[in-house]
Amino acid sequence: MPIKSRIRSIPDYPKKGILFRDITTLIKDPVGFRLVIDSLTQHYLQEGMDFDVIVGIEARGFIIGGALSYALGKGFIPVRKPGKLPADVVSQEYQLEYGSDTIEIHVDALVAGQKVLLVDDLLATGGTALAAAALVEKVGGIVAEMAFIVNLPDIGGERKILEKGYSIYSLTDFEGE
């Protein structure tokens, strides 16, 4: 059973008119979770992509990024919501559909020039991913690529990210669905 068929779709969540792609059904299934991590691991081993560390975006990016870090023998760095990291941080505000939000990373999370694989569960508008990329660059890192389980290309995040010059890899797309 492929990855896409293990993802639950919830209409009108978190608000009317949104079709939410819920990966919890995918990752609660041990075969599904293994399929995600093994697929990403094989992709990055076969590509031979040069990166030093994985940066995961709170919260589901921690689940995927942590397991992938272990599988690839790479370190893991969290990007968190404000007030969750104990040492000095750098912050990045970004726009949501209604309002704004902020994410943070430790000032000393990366060494200048370190190459990063940025990981999250889903790419929709691209706002969170671009904010995380800005944080990585503020602390001296270089984004080698962004990886997602799900890409929703019709929402426009993929286009925004590619226009900024970043590379994207996703395991599955939901186009026009």
UniProtKB/Swiss-Prot annotation:
List, in alphabetical order, the GO biological process terms annotated in this UniProt record.
adenine salvage; AMP salvage; purine ribonucleoside salvage
Task: List, alphabetically, the CDD domains matched.
Answer: PRTases_typeI
Pfam annotation, one family: Pribosyltran
Principal localisation: cytoplasm
Q: Does the keyword Transcription apply?
A: no
Give a yes or no for keyword DNA damage in this entry: no
Reactions this protein catalyses: AMP + diphosphate = 5-phospho-alpha-D-ribose 1-diphosphate + adenine
Location within or outside the cell: Cytoplasm
For this protein, what is the EC number? 2.4.2.7
Pathway in which the depicted protein is active: Purine metabolism; AMP biosynthesis via salvage pathway; AMP from adenine: step 1/1
Output this protein's name. Answer: Adenine phosphoribosyltransferase
